[in-house]
């Protein structure tokens, strides 16, 4: 008899996270590794825990996450977005507090593509008048 689980998909930059919340004791498992093993940076761990700490649910749920693509920062943001969506599925009244903290909105900023004739997306080659 499995407990009810809540699901949320989070995205940030090129990362996608699938988040499953189950009633439990506060375990966070990312790609079959603990959060401390997966993220070396403390800032990334803080970002992941933010929505759970905001609604005082750190000890209520076991969180199982699979995340793909992108780098450390993008993956942490995607996980935060996924946890937020799963929490809203669990209790819709949390939406207001999560929105006021800015976790509900998907951060749509992506890397701008490099253009032909330029060195980077916008950086032009040095101009010489003579």
UniProtKB/Swiss-Prot annotation:
The gene is rpsI. GO terms for biological process: translation. GO terms for molecular function: RNA binding; structural constituent of ribosome. GO terms for cellular component: cytosolic small ribosomal subunit. The keyword Ribonucleoprotein applies. It holds the Pfam family Ribosomal_S9. Residues 107-130 are annotated as: Disordered. Residues 116-130 have a biased composition (Basic residues). Belongs to the universal ribosomal protein uS9 family. Keywords: Ribonucleoprotein, Ribosomal protein. This is Small ribosomal subunit protein uS9. It comes from the Bacteria. InterPro entries: Ribosomal_Su5_D2-typ_SF, Ribosomal_uS9, Ribosomal_uS9_bac/plastid, Ribosomal_uS9_CS, Ribsml_uS5_D2-typ_fold_subgr.
């Amino acid at each position: 008899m499995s407990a009810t689980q809540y699901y949320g998909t989070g995205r940030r930059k090129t990362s996608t996270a699938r988040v499953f919340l189950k009633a439990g004791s506060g375990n966070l498992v990312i790609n079959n590794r603990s959060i401390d093993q997966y993220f070396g940076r403390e800032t990334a761990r803080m970002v992941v825990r933010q929505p759970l700490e905001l609604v005082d649910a750190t000890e209520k749920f076991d969180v199982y996450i699979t995340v793909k693509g992108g780098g450390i920062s993008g993956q942490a943001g995607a996980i935060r977005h996924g946890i937020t969506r799963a929490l809203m599925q669990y209790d819709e009244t949390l939406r207001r507090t999560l929105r006021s903290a800015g976790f509900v909105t998907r951060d749509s900023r992506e890397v701008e593509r490099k253009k032909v004739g330029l060195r980077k997306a916008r950086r032009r080659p040095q101009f010489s008048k003579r």
